[in-house]
Amino acid sequence: MKAFYGMLVIFILCSTCYISVDSQIDTNVKCSGSSKCVKICIDRYNTRGAKCINGRCTCYP
């Protein structure tokens, strides 16, 4: 029974990681900081979740 709960926890963690990576939206907009991306993400995707990753804006719904 302990093995079942262990496998269930691993499955939930893997599913959450897969969904969170799949839900991000990469843009081709250059940025120098995450604060520059917020307006772009609000205008294009209606979300405030934004990060500047590798010089490009990434939006999170």
Swiss-Prot record:
The record's annotation in Pfam families points to: Toxin_2
An example GO BP is: venom-mediated suppression of platelet aggregation
GO CC, sorted alphabetically, is: extracellular region
Q: What is this protein called?
A: Potassium channel toxin alpha-KTx 15.6
Q: Which SUPFAM superfamilies is this protein grouped with?
A: Scorpion toxin-like (SSF57095)
Q: Which cysteines are joined by disulfide bonds?
A: 31-52, 37-57, 41-59
Record's family? Belongs to the short scorpion toxin superfamily. Potassium channel inhibitor family. Alpha-KTx 15 subfamily.
Residues the record annotates as the site (Aromatic residue of the functional dyad) are 60
